[in-house]
Amino acid sequence: MINYKVIPLGEILNKEYDVQLIEQAFKEFSCQRETDLENFLIQKAIPYEKTNYGKTHLIIDEDKLKNEGKFVVAAYFTIAQNSIDISQLSGKKKRKMLGAYPGRDSLNSIPSYLIGQLGRCDAYSGKELSGQQILDECYHAISIAARVVGGNLLIVECRECMYDKFYEKKGFKKLYDELSDEGLYTLYQKI
């Protein structure tokens, strides 16, 4: 298990860090199974942060930072606000998903938190930094927002294999049984 520190990207950008060093660390992040994670970190994380569209949290290898002075992204997650379309859900599914939410049967959409990205660098094993640890850090960040603005629904989109291997075991349920046009399941979880 590695020693790590979770640092919101916004805090790094607001301080006098060398943005080129941060961008270089992003380029060194590798996730061969989900190259979307690599692309997002390199191309979109900073613009999303600057526009407040989504907030990225970096899980930094603290030992490499202290001992080698090297900024290494071991994992990261991005969270955002979202509105999810529930107009096609049955009344039963809405009740199951929303419980006693006021006016739930007539709602067409509902606010939620979105995990837009969540992943670990290939340089780290699941024993060094587990998916559960990353997810727990994500839950913690969302819980801070939920205490301020409310909300109790979490959404994530994932490939079929990740639903079977990870998210189903973590209590996520399919919003729709079929895959989207992009080949993704939309999953939800109450928080």
Regions found by a protein language model. Name each.
Residues M1-G126, Q133-I155, R159, D164-I191:
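Non-catalytic substrate-recognition and accessory regions of acyl/acetyltransferase enzymes
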